[in-house]
């Protein structure tokens, strides 16, 4: 099934023609890479896919309701957070469901079966999405990218630019979007971390 498709893409940057009637299709679970010299339009293509740039002509077709994750290493981060707090925000929707579950169980304390059944349904959703293994998932990714040694309780404001870029990458990996768009993800990674990332991505079921 096609998750993302570009057809008839033509786009220029100033007088430099980057794409002429180009296209590609990204299917479910498919892993593709785009290589080229600096200035050939790799980053531009990703921004076209994420609708940050409108192409001169062509169509970008996305499956409805899919999630697309884009690696922006220079995104603004809330500096009041610790690394762990920021990484936990990758699971914000699950934490919202947890609050709903607790509220429903409170309402069901008087024997309301409707609220009890609803709470059980949401509880199952949490278990399906490995909610109770979040800390383990965070430690695995943080360790793979060399962040665990820094300390998960380290405030973001105390981290270097390279460390923050790795934290942004870690959060994106934890979010597990349907489509993962990575623009030079090995920036700031040493050899061991690059090897870990390659192995992690090769085992990923989602498309990137």
Feature names for model-found ranges:
Residues 1-208:
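ABC ATP-binding cassette signature C-motif
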């Amino acid at each position: 099934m096609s998750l993302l498709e570009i057809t008839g893409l033509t786009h220029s940057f100033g007088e430099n023609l980057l794409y002429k009637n180009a296209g590609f299709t990204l299917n479910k679970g498919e892993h593709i890479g785009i290589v080229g010299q600096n200035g050939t339009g790799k980053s531009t293509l990703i921004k076209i896919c994420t609708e940050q740039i409108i192409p001169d002509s062509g169509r970008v077709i996305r499956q409805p309701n899919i999630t697309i994750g884009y690696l922006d290493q220079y995104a603004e981060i809330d500096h009041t957070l610790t690394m762990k707090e920021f990484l936990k925000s990758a699971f914000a929707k699950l934490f919202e469901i947890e609050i709903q579950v607790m509220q429903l169980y409170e309402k069901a304390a008087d024997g309301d079966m409707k609220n009890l059944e609803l709470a059980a349904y949401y509880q199952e959703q949490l278990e399906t999405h490995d909610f109770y293994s979040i800390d383990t998932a965070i430690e695995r990714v943080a360790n793979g990218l060399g962040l665990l040694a820094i300390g998960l309780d380290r405030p973001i404001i105390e981290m270097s630019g390279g460390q923050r870029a790795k934290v942004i990458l870690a959060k994106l990996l934890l979010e597990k979007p349907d489509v993962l768009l990575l623009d030079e993800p090995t920036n700031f990674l040493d050899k061991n971390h690059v090897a870990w990332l390659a192995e992690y991505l090769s085992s990923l079921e989602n498309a990137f």
